[in-house]
């Protein structure tokens, strides 16, 4: 009650103070208005006097000039000879002009002196703002009556004009003071409100700094990007022009794709704690691997691979022939790096190189890089170019990669990189900014929701390899075949069959069991998924299907929907991780088996051991579970619980809880678990697609 009374008292006091100030303001405003009217009257009187004196001065000067003309004309006519009347007239005009100039000079001098005297008088007689004009005007009137001469009248007119200017200046000062006084009263009356308003206005607008790297390492040259300046330049280019035009993309290629990625619709990425940067151990292992490879047969390909691995500029069709001589060739060490191999997708059309859109990315598996789990939504935000006839980006073959390029184009990017016609990489371990507070919050959320601190050890790798017909799971089940592949090529990995990139016959490695692969691009992607979600899914077997069967809380504050979305997102991400890691392992074993001379068996064994050690280390650091060649007979429900339904890259939005129909689960038999059924489903699809590919 005391607070209520105090509030009422302050309100009444404020109201009284406001009324008093308003009354004071009205009184002073009336006073200023009356003074302003007096000033206006004085100014009008001065203007009339100035006009009268100007007319008088003009008339008097005209009379004097006429009298002078009358006196000088007969004298000049007498002096001029009758034989030369023109000369006499010209001399008369000259003398007349000289006399006029002298008179004008005298008049100007008198005006200047009169102005100086008037300024001195004004300085001496300046008094109050209102009453200083009355004695000035009376003095001017007396002076005008007392001095009938031309010079005094001119001085008087000058003084009147000076008084007029000073009056105008004083009027401007008075109006300024009136305005400032009004503002002062307004501020005092609204003191409390102005305090709160100014406090709210002075609150800084928090701007989110884009999470990315401002420097791009492009062929060991650092190119700084100022997004602020380039946004205005490239906004029109992004909206109006085609992305695949040659000159515009070469000039502003890096900034254009950066802006394009920023201007895509803000589809929220899934919440993750996937900011697992490679530690110093992974870097040291990678450096040892790189030094080992530097002494082998990678060095001759350095210039060409560096040229082809310029990630920011599209390659013209004239350079396609330079790309393909090394296409399909394996190195002497039998190791193929999957550095920055883009996934190529086009529509179901004949191989005419039209409507080819390079829309996905691939990160290096050699260093501890991770692929963002938001593959599905990012694939939709990438734009498909319309005219690749003139210029198109050729996906670089993994056999051409050089270990130095992994350093110059660091693939440990914290965001998923687009390889649409201009590819952009945010790179560098030490320059990547990290939001520590956000990471801590997400870790706390994950510990609370998923209880990830119970099981933090990675599941051991399973190296048992089986047949290709049982192991292969295609990345795209709706793909159509455009060429022919042998079964030995099927073992070596998954081939994307919907990309029309013809490869010459003579560029295939001379292996009698292999055929020419037309229209195929190898897809090898590494993935180090976050530790917590993988183990959480294995420990609890949480899926959207299991979660939706549990009773939903009626509390509006429950985060049931958030958890369900997270589970759906990471289910799709972990399925792609399993496929990609298995694909890499199959490719690795096939490469080691298909080596054609040049390197000893001990070198291959050493490289294989280094690869296995490196994979084990990265699995411990990032919590990755790599399943390489798992037999479907040994798959249990726990091991396959992370597999999601194969289909589109996004999940259908969930219906409200009270309207879910039981027909969604009617097709399932109650005895068989859903994970095993999903496994067999994928198995049949892989057999069918393999039959298409062979």
UniProtKB/Swiss-Prot annotation:
The gene is KIAA0408. Transmembrane segments: none annotated. It comes from the Eukaryota. Residues 15-51 form a coiled coil. This is Uncharacterized protein KIAA0408. Residues 272-283, 476-490 have a biased composition (Polar residues). Keywords: Coiled coil. Residues 663-677 have a biased composition (Low complexity). Pfam families: SOGA1-2-like_CC. The keyword Coiled coil applies. Disulfide bonds: none annotated. Residues 259-286, 461-490, 643-680 are annotated as: Disordered. It comes from Homo sapiens. InterPro entries: SOGA1/2-like_CC.
């Amino acid at each position: 009650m005391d607070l209520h009374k105090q509030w009422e008292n302050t309100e009444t006091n404020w109201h009284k103070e406001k009324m008093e100030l308003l009354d004071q303001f009205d009184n002073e405003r009336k006073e200023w208005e009356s003074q302003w009217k007096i000033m206006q009257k004085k100014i009008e009187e001065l203007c009339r006097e100035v006009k009268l004196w100007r007319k008088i001065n003009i008339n008097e000067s005209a009379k004097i000039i006429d009298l002078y003309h009358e006196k000088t004309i007969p004298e000049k006519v007498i002096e001029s000879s009758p034989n030369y009347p023109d000369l006499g007239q010209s001399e008369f005009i000259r003398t007349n002009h000289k006399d006029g100039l002298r008179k004008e000079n005298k008049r100007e001098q008198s005006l200047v002196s009169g102005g100086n005297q008037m300024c001195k008088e004004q300085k001496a007689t300046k008094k109050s703002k209102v009453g200083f004009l009355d004695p000035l005007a009376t003095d001017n009137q007396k002076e005008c009556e007392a001095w009938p001469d031309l010079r005094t009248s001119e001085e008087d007119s000058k003084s009147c004009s000076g008084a007029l200017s000073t009056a105008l200046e004083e009027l401007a000062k008075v109006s300024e003071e009136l305005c400032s006084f009004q503002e002062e009263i307004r501020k005092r009356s609204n003191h409390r409100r102005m305090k709160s308003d100014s406090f709210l206005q002075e609150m800084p607008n928090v701007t989110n700094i884009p999470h990315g790297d401002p420097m791009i390492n492009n062929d060991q040259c650092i190119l700084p990007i100022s997004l602020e300046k380039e946004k205005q330049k490239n906004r029109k280019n992004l909206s109006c022009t085609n992305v695949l035009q040659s000159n515009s993309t070469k000039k502003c290629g890096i900034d254009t794709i950066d802006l394009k990625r920023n201007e895509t619709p803000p589809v929220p990425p899934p919440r993750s704690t996937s900011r697992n940067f490679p530690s110093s151990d992974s870097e040291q292992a990678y450096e040892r691997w790189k030094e080992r490879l530097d002494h082998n047969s990678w060095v001759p390909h350095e210039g060409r691979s560096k040229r082809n691995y310029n990630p920011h500029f599209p390659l013209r069709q004239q350079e396609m022939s330079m790309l393909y001589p090394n296409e399909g060739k394996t190195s002497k060490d039998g190791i193929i790096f999957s550095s920055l191999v883009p996934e190529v997708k086009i529509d179901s059309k004949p191989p005419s190189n039209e409507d080819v859109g390079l829309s996905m990315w691939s990160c290096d598996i050699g260093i501890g890089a991770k692929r963002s789990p938001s593959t599905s939504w990012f694939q939709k935000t990438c734009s498909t170019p319309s005219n690749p006839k003139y210029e198109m980006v050729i996906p670089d073959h993994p056999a051409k990669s050089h270990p130095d390029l992994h350093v110059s184009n660091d693939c440990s990017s914290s965001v998923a990189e687009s390889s649409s016609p201009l590819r952009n990489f945010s790179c560098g371990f030490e320059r990547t900014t990290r939001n520590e507070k956000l990471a801590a919050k997400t870790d706390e959320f994950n510990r609370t929701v998923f209880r990830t601190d119970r099981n933090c050890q990675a599941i051991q790798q399973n190296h048992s390899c089986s047949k290709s017909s049982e192991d292969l799971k295609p990345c795209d089940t709706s793909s159509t075949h455009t060429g022919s592949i042998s079964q030995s090529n099927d073992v070596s990995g998954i081939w994307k069959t919907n990309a029309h990139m013809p490869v010459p016959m003579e560029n295939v490695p001379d292996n009698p069991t292999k055929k020419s692969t037309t229209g195929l691009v190898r897809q090898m992607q590494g993935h180090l998924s976050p530790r917590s979600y993988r183990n959480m899914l294995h420990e609890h077997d949480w899926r959207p299907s299991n979660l939706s069967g549990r009773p939903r809380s009626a509390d509006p504050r429950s985060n049931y929907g958030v958890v369900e979305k997270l589970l759906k997102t990471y289910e799709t991400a972990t399925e792609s991780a399993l496929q990609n890691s298995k694909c890499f392992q199959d490719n690795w074993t096939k490469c080691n088996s298909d080596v054609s001379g040049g390197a000893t068996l001990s070198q291959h064994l050493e490289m294989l051991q280094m690869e296995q050690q490196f994979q084990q280390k990265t699995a411990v650091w990032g919590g990755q579970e790599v399943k390489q060649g798992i037999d479907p007979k040994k798959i249990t429900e726990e091991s396959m619980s992370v597999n999601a339904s194969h289909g589109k890259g996004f999940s259908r939005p969930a219906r409200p809880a009270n309207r879910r129909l039981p027909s969604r689960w009617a097709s399932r038999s109650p005895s068989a678990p859903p994970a095993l059924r999903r496994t067999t489903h994928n198995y049949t699809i892989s057999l069918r697609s393999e039959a298409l590919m062979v």
